[in-house]
Swiss-Prot record:
GO terms for molecular function: mRNA binding; ribosome binding. Residues 52-61, 970-986 have a biased composition (Basic residues). Residues 1447-1465 have a biased composition (Polar residues). Residues 427-669 form the Clu domain. Belongs to the CLU family. This is Protein clueless. Residues 742-767 have a biased composition (Basic and acidic residues). One of its GO terms (biological process) is ribosome localization. InterPro entries: CLU-central, CLU_dom, CLU_N, CLU_prot, GSKIP_dom, GSKIP_dom_sf, TPR-like_helical_dom_sf. TPR repeats lie at residues 1114-1147, 1240-1273, 1275-1308. The keyword Endoplasmic reticulum does not apply. Pfam families: CLU (PF13236), CLU_N (PF15044), eIF3_p135 (PF12807), GSKIP_dom (PF05303), TPR_10 (PF13374), TPR_12 (PF13424). It comes from Drosophila virilis (Fruit fly). The gene is clu.
Length: 1465
């Protein structure tokens, strides 16, 4: 809050340095939202030993001096919330250097190559900046060392960046252990007070080694409150209560608990000193994993208690006479010694006064002790406080920096322990002291969200620093808006906000809170009557959000969308939207200048909207089309009819109601004039869905157009070859040119599958590629060039070829490849203007195209999705990862039933089949739960939820316990009077225009009137639900929604038939609907009492859907880095991805999912480059970040843990490596059970390490389980299976069981021989292993025969000498299993290969042509691939790591996530 005022004042005066920077000073609790770590939080990281700052190599991006426009824009935006502090980049500072001149995270090294590639990255990925010379040097600043002198502490020497603000030194001091208790001070240099918002480089007298003094300043009321709040935060710092309660963007991480400290500080462990026994719940064969280990060591998490009570006194506020004596406020404290004190805060500091609970005496106590810091005063009066505070501070500073930074969005926990509810005046004040909390204290008014959101998008974006500033501002304001919208939606449903139309039915009520408009997901005024009623109204906000996302991604200047957040809470769906200026002052009909407010009966158009939407439509593949209005006049539209254009009072052109941005899905619409293909009809399509808003996904349209484009090129090439075969003179040219054209067009599809399939959303964010129209023209030109030596008639023939190809693929234009879609083509009630047959405006052609796209989804995309997952390279782990994978292929979740049918016929896809069934059950149950919750009184919520969970997850007794007095009929609350009815109805009218879309959002306000008399009769309906009735409803819902037959009628039959775990179903359901259950072990088999009771429901939390702003330049660097890695240039890739991380830090701050992906990639690259210690340091941060931003049991977190265990082992932390694998295995089994390909990978890793430690029996159990899974999912002849057999043979030979070992090694040899051939290195190694095992087995048998022949044991029988494997060989095998292979190539080999290539190239090129480096490197890669006989790198054992690191390694990795093929010479 403090900072918001500073920022506002700064903005008003136009102070260039201050705009938006004020956020840095703010304590997290004073902020409406804490998503992006502020500058102070960055310094919090810098101050930590974990994040040592590299000299001057921090990527600090500042805007150039702001001109008047920017100053005005920044003033408008968010009162100081526009930026997330200047680069909260804990990450950028700690990337270890890779080779000389490669800075931490800097692309620009000593050589120019890095910089060139970086510029290329931006140029390649950003069409708008194609001509821009990106000066990365300008983004890197120089370091400066200063001394800071504070009262009562030693002089502190700190390294700072010249681009940091003075404010950031404040935050640094407030975070350091020695000075953290100071909040009210100024910084002086040579007795001159420094401006908080000045950059250090602008201070003339500041030099290397200057001393800055900390000077205590007098308190004001505001500063005193900030100080008390800061003290409370310091005392509560270790308490995880806020993370469990989902407050202030705090979240949990348990890596430190599992590793018992920082991994980097640990020494290597000797194998014989490691405790490696796995917990029972980690060993193979566990039925239901326990719940308690999910949150380890929660008893010791809180830390020591320093005070019993710290609260504001009831004697507040100071009376007039005391104000004149300087009293600001009074505090009440109870120490651990049980002493009670009343404390006065005055301008000089804090002192004990003589007041008691009954008597007010504000005079200082005797002897008086005045302290500028409250901590000093409390330490003086309480020895217990002093000891506890020191312990808290010690533990706080020991925590990793990433554990203390706020996350961008709130992460909620689905299980929480019983938390002690303590006295906390500040928490109470936040809840009740004002309607809105701290926003209200901003001078003037509450925040104007719409103005902030739109102003940030208007910021300049021509240069890289400008784009970074703009994206940072967009991200910060968006994050604040999401937090405010979530808070408002919860307040609406809890009944704490007055409706703007209180006289209407609860379902029809709308709300405005904090300048945000809220509406509920019900069909008010029969708006969606024809489209599916409440069902349509419920899904419309989600489709609208998709529309907002894609229009924001296209980012057309001058076209504006509303800030939109969709929140599901307590069974209701709420849409939160920013408010268009002036919309509340006009009737809806006056507001809309484009589109239709009545689904096409009346239609308007507007030239400016046509211009803007036509630009957007090029990227979104939307076809401009004409419809007839009520006067039968044609009206041109460049969007769907429902899309409305409103010009606000601010002159901006807004579009809203974007629910039909994409074409309809005809497979789920029963239309009279549409005949689906035979294949689709046989599959049961069309299926009549419960609403008519089903549309195709953008990812599908992109894949469809790409598929058609490839077909188009092939057809054109074939026709041209036939044409040119007749022309003898042109034959040679034709054969060279045309296949080249076809290949050229096909290459992008093959080279960039990640872009099209895994990251479709990112595609939108990067600058659009040229349209297919231009591509087609380019191809035609190329064809003409190829035919230039032929007669003019051939040009006509070439054009005919293109025409035929266009006709074959169904292009809208006859002579050009053109694929765009009319979103209104099947909309009921809309009258289209039909163009001539064969033309772009031909309605039949448009309909055919939409039908073809829907058919492509079923016949090509779903099989492609299944085929892709057959390799199990990155298998989905839970419903969320399955959904993301479906969406990346453009497959809607409504096709899940079809996907399950296809998976059910494939035993090798059993795990995915089971995950899909769990997801379909959870989603069906969610639909039922929402209806169930809407008819439940707030009084009975915990009883109703626990009863529902009992019915879902148990078959025991489920009698709901509701006390009789609670069942008495409640009197309806008197809704603010009938005389307001007319006024309220009038107010609601214009607002319907403000959020047409809002009509479609979540469902009803629980406290705001949903439980009034109309609902009372059904308030106890929830008590009638039984397990049998609930599962019958689930079956009906699955059949109705997904057209799939669920063959079970209870949780027991579901478990028996489909292998579902109850704990997995509980987790998935709680996360889906927002329930937090008590962390304890649940007995689901109980026959005597219900499994869940009222007290087991700890909380309900909102499930929030919103748009995630992207960092486009960072994305371009990242994708260019990935391309470099694919080409084998690991160092260049590392540098580019480091730079991407720096840019992400600038935009998002230190904590974000995308930062996590960069860290994981950098750790893997460090490991491949031979720096295992650096890999460990980076991966440790990746694990903490994933736990914090994704969740402690998120699939990404499991992946991070497995990577960290490998790097831990490589660094000699053997025991720690096992603990990390045990954690990963536990989480994986909790989420999806033991029957999963990833479990096989983890079990193989565990087995190997246990084998190295001599725990052979345990090791054998894990490898047997891994082998069983590998056989099931990869087949008998797979390389995974060969490796498992080989590992088992190694373990059994160490146990002396040579016969079994021999049998298993024979299996390995058999697989290698059949897959790789007899001469392959792996086959030869296996044959040698067989020979040794045979020798050992024969020797043992001889000894046994001697014993039998002598009839007794001979005392001198030599023991079997079992040599455990060396750590080096175990690491090699671990690398192999985890997809990393080092192939050693000697320098001599490389020289030989190089000369061969040069010879070969010379024969094929002119004498003057010299092959460039990339050609030779490419050829080298080909040869390396040939040497390995196309062997899958992840399934072969590697030679000595040490040798490869010393020579010139070729690294081939094909892990679960990144595949790398590299040659470095």
């Amino acid at each position: 809050m403090a900072l918001e005022i500073d920022a506002k004042n700064a903005a008003a005066t136009g102070d260039a340095g201050t705009i938006g920077k004020a956020k840095a000073k703010e304590n997290k609790n004073h902020n409406n939202n804490n998503n992006a770590p502020a500058a102070g939080e960055k310094n919090l990281v810098n101050g930590s030993s974990a994040a040592t700052k590299k000299k001057g190599k921090k990527n600090r991006n500042k805007s150039p001096p702001q001109n008047a426009v920017e100053a005005e824009a920044s003033a408008a935006l968010s009162n100081g919330h526009s930026e997330n502090g200047d680069a909260a980049d804990a990450n950028a500072n700690v990337l270890a250097e890779k080779g000389e001149g490669v800075a931490a995270g800097a692309v620009v090294g000593d050589g120019a190559e890095g910089g060139a590639s970086a510029e290329g990255a931006v140029a390649e990925g950003d069409a708008a900046a194609a001509g821009e010379d990106v000066d990365l040097d300008a983004l890197h600043d120089i370091g400066i060392t200063v001394n800071i002198s504070s009262p009562g502490t030693d002089v502190l020497s700190v390294q700072l960046s010249s681009m940091e603000l003075v404010q950031e030194i404040h935050q640094l001091l407030m975070d350091r252990e020695e000075t953290c208790h100071r909040t009210c001070f100024s910084l002086q240099l040579d007795n001159v007070t420094l401006d908080n918002f000045a950059e250090l480089k602008t201070i003339e007298s500041l030099e290397q080694g200057s001393t800055i003094r900390v000077v205590e300043e007098p308190y004001t009321m505001r500063e005193a409150r900030i100080h008390v709040r800061h003290v409370r935060d310091l005392l509560k710092n270790l308490d995880p209560a806020d993370a469990y309660n989902g407050i202030d963007c705090t979240s949990l991480t348990y890596l430190n608990t599992i590793t018992q400290g920082d991994l980097l500080d640990k020494k290597r462990t000797r194998p014989d000193s490691v405790d490696c026994t796995p917990p029972d719940y980690v060993t193979p064969g566990v039925r239901e994993p326990p719940l308690l280990p999910l949150h380890p060591n929660i008893k010791n998490a809180k830390g020591p208690q320093a005070l019993k009570v710290l609260t504001t006194s009831a004697w507040n506020p100071p009376p007039g006479p005391r104000k004149l004596h300087g009293d600001l406020m009074y505090l009440y404290v109870v120490t651990m010694e049980d002493k009670r004190f009343h404390i006065s805060a005055c301008s000089k500091g804090f002192y004990i006064n003589q007041s008691t609970d009954e008597c007010f005496n504000p005079k200082p106590d005797n002897p008086s002790h005045l302290s500028h810091s409250l901590i000093d005063l409390l330490s003086h009066i309480s020895p217990s406080f002093r000891r506890a505070f020191q312990a808290i501070q010690k533990r706080r500073t020991m925590r990793h920096a990433f554990e203390r930074v706020a996350t961008p969005y709130q992460v909620y926990q689905w299980a929480a322990p019983q938390l002690e509810h303590t006295v906390d005046a500040i928490r109470a004040e936040d809840a009740f002291s004002s309607k809105l909390g701290y926003e209200e204290h901003i001078p003037g008014q509450t925040r104007d969200w719409n103005e902030e959101l739109q102003t940030t998008r208007e910021l300049p974006r021509k240069t890289l620093p400008e784009r970074l500033l703009r994206e940072r501002a967009i991200f910060k304001v968006h994050g604040d808006f999401v937090t405010a919208a979530t808070r408002g939606a919860m307040a609406v449903i809890d009944g704490n906000v007055l409706a703007i139309n209180p006289g209407e039915d609860a379902k029809m009520q709308m709300f405005i809170w904090n300048n945000i408009f809220f509406s509920l997901g019900f069909d008010v005024r029969d708006h969606y009557k024809e489209l599916g009623g409440d069902h349509a109204a419920f899904v419309a906000p989600r489709y609208d959000l998709h529309g907002v996302r894609v229009y924001n991604a296209v980012d057309i200047e001058g076209l504006y969308t509303l800030g939109t957040v969709v929140i599901d809470y307590r069974g209701y769906r709420v849409t939160a939207q920013s408010i268009i200026p002036g919309i509340l002052e006009r009737e809806q009909e006056q507001s809309v200048v484009y589109g239709s407010i009545d689904f096409g009966k009346t239609v308007l158009s507007h030239p400016k909207y046509l211009e803007l939407l036509r630009q957007a439509g090029k990227h979104l593949k939307i076809l401009p089309h004409s419809v007839l209005n009520e006067r039968d006049e044609p009206v041109e539209l460049c969007s769907s009819v429902e899309c409305k254009g409103i010009i606000g009072n601010d002159g901006r052109h807004y579009i809203l109601d974007l629910l039909r941005t994409f074409p309809p899905d005809v497979n789920f619409l029963k239309l009279q004039d549409v005949q689906l293909s035979k294949e689709l009809t046989e599959m049961g399509f069309p299926i009549e869905h419960r609403h008519k808003l089903c549309c195709l996904r953008q990812e599908l349209l992109e894949a469809f157009i790409e598929d058609r484009y490839v077909t188009f090129i092939r057809i054109a090439a074939v026709h041209l070859q036939q044409l040119n075969a007749k022309k003898q003179a042109a034959t040679a040219n034709a054969e060279k040119e045309l296949p080249a054209i076809a290949e050229k067009q096909e290459e992008p599809n093959e080279e960039q599958p990640e872009k099209t399939e895994e990251q479709p959303a990112e595609k939108e964010e990067s600058k659009p590629t040229p349209s297919e129209t231009k591509s087609a023209e380019a191809m035609v030109n190329a064809i003409r060039e190829a035919q230039s030596n032929v007669a003019v008639s051939n040009e006509v023939q070439a054009a005919e070829v293109v025409k035929r190809a266009c006709a074959a693929v169904g292009s809208l234009k006859e002579k050009e490849f053109d694929f765009r879609f009319n979103p209104d083509v099947f909309s009921p009630g809309i009258r289209h203007v039909d163009g001539p047959d064969g033309g772009v405006q031909s309605l039949a052609k448009q309909k055919r195209l939409v039908q073809d796209a829907a058919e492509f989804l079923v016949l090509k995309q779903i099989p492609a999705f299944i085929k892709e997952h057959m390799a199990h390279s990155s298998p989905p782990i839970d419903g969320q990862s399955l959904t993301e994978s479906l969406h990346s292929h453009g497959i809607n979740v409504r096709y899940l039933g079809k996907v399950i049918k296809m998976l059910g016929q494939m035993p090798r896809m059993d795990y995915l089949h089971r995950i899909a069934i769990l997801e379909i059950i959870v989603r069906a149950t969610k639909h039922i739960y929402y209806t169930y919750m809407q008819s439940t009184e707030p009084l009975h919520l915990s009883a109703a939820i626990s009863h529902f969970l009992n019915c879902l997850l148990t078959t025991g007794p489920v009698n709901p316990a509701v006390s009789s007095d609670e069942l008495h009929k409640k009197q309806p609350r008197n809704n603010s009077g009938k005389h307001n009815k007319h006024k309220a109805a009038k107010a609601s009218k214009p607002q319907a225009a403000a959020a047409q879309n809002g009509n479609a959002t979540a469902a009803g306000s629980g406290g705001a009137g949903a439980t009034t008399s109309g609902a009372t009769s059904s308030n106890s309906d929830w008590t009638l639900v039984t397990p049998r009735s609930l599962w019958q409803q689930i079956r009906k819902e699955v059949k109705a929604y997904w057209n799939w037959e669920l063959d079970c009628d209870s949780i027991e039959s579901a478990g028996a038939k489909y292998g579902l775990l109850r704990i997995s179903l509980l987790r998935a359901f709680c996360l889906k609907v927002g329930i937090q259950v008590l962390l304890r072990e649940y007995n689901f088999e109980s026959k005597h009492k219900p499994t869940f009771g009222d007290d087991d429901i700890v909380n309900v939390f909102p499930v929030v859907k919103h748009i995630s702003p992207r960092a486009t330049d960072a994305y371009n660097f990242y994708t260019t880095g990935q391309a470099k890695i694919q080409q084998g240039m690991l160092k260049e890739g590392y540098e580019l991805i480091s730079e991407a991380l720096n840019l992400l830090n600038n935009v998002f701050g230190a904590m974000h999912q995308e930062n996590d992906s960069c860290l994981r990639m950098l750790a893997r690259l460090s490991y491949l480059l031979g720096d295992a210690q650096d890999a460990l340091a980076i991966q440790q941060r990746a694990v903490i970040m994933s736990e914090r931003v994704n969740g402690i049991d998120h699939p990404s977190t499991i992946l991070e843990y497995t990577h960290l265990s490998l790097y831990s082992f490589a660094n000699g932390h053997v025991g720690m490596s096992l603990k990390l694998l045990y954690r990963a295995r536990y989480l994986l089994v909790l989420i999806c059970g033991e029957d999963h390909p990833e479990v096989a990978l983890i079990d193989s890793n565990i087995s190997l390490i246990l084998h190295a430690l001599g725990e052979y029996e345990l090791s054998l159990r894990f490898i047997e389980h891994a082998l069983k899974l590998n056989l099931k999912y990869f087949g008998n002849k797979a390389m995974h299976v060969a490796v498992s057999y080989h590992l088992m043979a190694r373990i059994q030979s160490c146990m002396g069981d040579f016969r079994s070992a021999l049998n298993n090694e024979k299996e390995t040899y058999s697989i290698y021989k059949s897959q790789l051939g007899e001469k392959h290195e792996k086959t030869r190694e296996s044959a040698e292993c067989l020979r040794l095992l045979t020798h050992e087995a024969v020797a043992l048998q001889r000894k046994m025969n001697d014993i039998y022949s002598n009839g007794k044991l001979t005392s001198d029988l030599p023991p079997i000498h079992i040599t455990p494997p060396s750590m080096g060989s175990v690491l090699e095998m671990l690398n192999t299993i985890n997809g990393i292979l080092f192939v050693h190539i000697s320098q001599k080999d490389i020289v030989k290969v190089r000369s061969e290539i040069e010879k070969h190239l010379k024969t094929n090129t002119d004498e003057n042509d010299v092959p460039d480096e990339s050609e030779i490197t490419s050829a080298l890669k080909t040869i390396v691939a040939a040497v390995n006989n196309n062997d899958n790198a992840s399934e072969t054992e590697q030679p000595k790591d040490e040798a490869s690191a010393a020579g010139t390694p070729t690294q081939l990795t094909n892990g679960s996530e990144e595949s790398t093929a590299t040659v470095s010479s």
